Amino acid sequence: MSRMAEQQLYIHGGYTSATSGRTFETINPANGNVLATVQAAGREDVDRAVKSAQQGQKIWASMTAMERSRILRRAVDILRERNDELAKLETLDTGKAYSETSTVDIVTGADVLEYYAGLIPALEGSQIPLRETSFVYTRREPLGVVAGIGAWNYPIQIALWKSAPALAAGNAMIFKPSEVTPLTALKLAEIYSEAGLPDGVFNVLPGVGAETGQYLTEHPGIAKVSFTGGVASGKKVMANSAASSLKEVTMELGGKSPLIVFDDADLDLAADIAMMANFFSSGQVCTNGTRVFVPAKCKAAFEQKILARVERIRAGDVFDPQTNFGPLVSFPHRDNVLRYIAKGKEEGARVLCGGDVLKGDGFDNGAWVAPTVFTDCSDDMTIVREEIFGPVMSILTYESEDEVIRRANDTDYGLAAGIVTADLNRAHRVIHQLEAGICWINTWGESPAEMPVGGYKHSGIGRENGVMTLQSYTQVKSIQVEMAKFQSIF
């Protein structure tokens, strides 16, 4: 693909040049080619976007629930019509296999938008009787202008997960995509405008997180920030949001999730789940189950089943329908993952497979890392303690249920957890003791629109998806009505 035209900001229904004068490049990680130069939003651009959003939000909030619902449904239709086009762009920008982006990224994002479009007319208040002459009623009102800050692993899906409930509740959103993968969020802005969204209700500001993101979190005109990213960055976003104007926040942060295989489990099922929990999207999924606990007596058999499945991984041309494994998203991220792999070797973990870059025709110029499985791991190893965010599985053994629950919870993270067992009683007993916000039994990874997702501990605050997320983009106004004569003591 030839280099794209320079990408601008999207403010008030159209493209506009950044006032900062700064740009950055976005790279195709499969081959290292530059996809596009992208303009970076500065402080003045954030001010412009907020002013635009304030104007648009008033128009949007004044529309009826059914009018807003119809517009968002039109956006859903356009997303589905352009699924393949958007998936190709997402593959170029992220490196993910087209077999994945064409069936997951836009599809699941559109599903979430459709879900919230349907919920808009059901967003209602309550009535509370006090006595015969007085009652209270409540209204759920939009917050105003909110900000979404996305991560680089699911660019358009995250933009939809954040914008869908925000817009459904009557807010305007300013979205800052990751500077690593900024392209599809700009396309989403075009689609919203085409669907009839008033100008300013969805503005997109590409830029460097440390600058553009900080300007958004500090801006007094922003009522809420929804952030997806790493724990350290999330803490900065939360601190800036609180210090500036006590903004509400939703944080979807990192994870080091446990996958527990019990001795009664079907090991073929367990191996299939472990593969999806570690190598889907080349391991760049925040909920990945990278700490795989297996009974000591099952370890050898489980390892053989994993090795057999690693042979089924197909890396290569990301547009080949048979490819199911792409490069990492960037060269700096590849180098970071390789440092973790080197650390695992240094600390005594045994490499079962992988452990290096992928080499050969088609791989040398890209950010490729081989699917890697470590075994003979211990809880104190760096690869077991820290989030790697790459195709690296760690296999650990255990002896008892109580032991594995304790060890699974021995982490600062609490995003996800899962178990594989044939015993339904054990499944619920163990899941209820695991300290994680998203849990799976005999499956892994699905996050449907109806399911609230978010983390415990350092893995986040608040939830995305589900009814409660729509409510989190509103504020409740309570009104007391008195029909009798008011009595004053003065």
From Swiss-Prot:
Activity vs pH = Optimum pH is between 7.5 and 9.5.
Signal peptide annotation: none
Q: Per the record, GO CC terms?
A: cytosol; protein-containing complex
Specify the superkingdom: Bacteria
EC numbers: 1.2.1.8
Pathway where this protein functions: Amine and polyamine biosynthesis; betaine biosynthesis via choline pathway; betaine from betaine aldehyde: step 1/1
- At which residues is there a site annotated Seems to be a necessary countercharge to the potassium cations? E248
- Give UniProt keywords alphabetically: Metal-binding, NAD, NADP, Oxidation, Oxidoreductase, Potassium, Stress response
| Active-site residues, as the UniProt record annotates them | K162, E252, C286, E464
InterPro entries found in the cross-reference section: Ald_DH/histidinol_DH (IPR016161), Ald_DH_C (IPR016163), Ald_DH_CS_CYS (IPR016160), Ald_DH_CS_GLU (IPR029510), Ald_DH_N (IPR016162), Aldehyde_DH_dom (IPR015590), BADH (IPR011264)
**Activity regulation annotation text:** Aldehydes with apolar groups are the most effective inhibitors. N-Methylated compounds are also inhibitory, but to a much lesser degree than the aldehydes. The alcohols are more inhibitory than the corresponding acids, and the inhibitory effect increases with the degree of methylation from ethanolamine to choline.
Annotated cofactor note: Binds 2 potassium ions per subunit.
Quote the record's binding site residues for K(+) 1.
Answer: T26, I27, D93, V180
Cysteine sulfenic acid (-SOH) sites (modified residues): C286
Q: Which reaction does it catalyse?
A: betaine aldehyde + NAD(+) + H2O = glycine betaine + NADH + 2 H(+); betaine aldehyde + NADP(+) + H2O = glycine betaine + NADPH + 2 H(+)
Q: Is the S-adenosyl-L-methionine keyword given for this protein?
A: no
Cofactors needed by this protein, per the record, are: K(+)
Q: Where does K(+) 2 bind?
A: L246, K457, G460
Q: Where are the transmembrane segments?
A: none
Q: Which GO terms describe its molecular function?
A: betaine-aldehyde dehydrogenase (NAD+) activity; identical protein binding; metal ion binding
Question: In which residues is NAD(+) bound?
Answer: G150, A151, W152, K176, P177, S178, E179, G230, V231, A232, S233, G254, C286, E387
Q: What class of enzyme is it?
A: oxidoreductase
Name the HAMAP family for this protein. BADH
Role summary: Involved in the biosynthesis of the osmoprotectant glycine betaine. Catalyzes the irreversible oxidation of betaine aldehyde to the corresponding acid. It is highly specific for betaine and has a significantly higher affinity for NAD than for NADP.
Similarity comment? Belongs to the aldehyde dehydrogenase family.
Full protein name: Betaine aldehyde dehydrogenase
According to its UniProt entry, this protein's organism is Escherichia coli (strain K12)
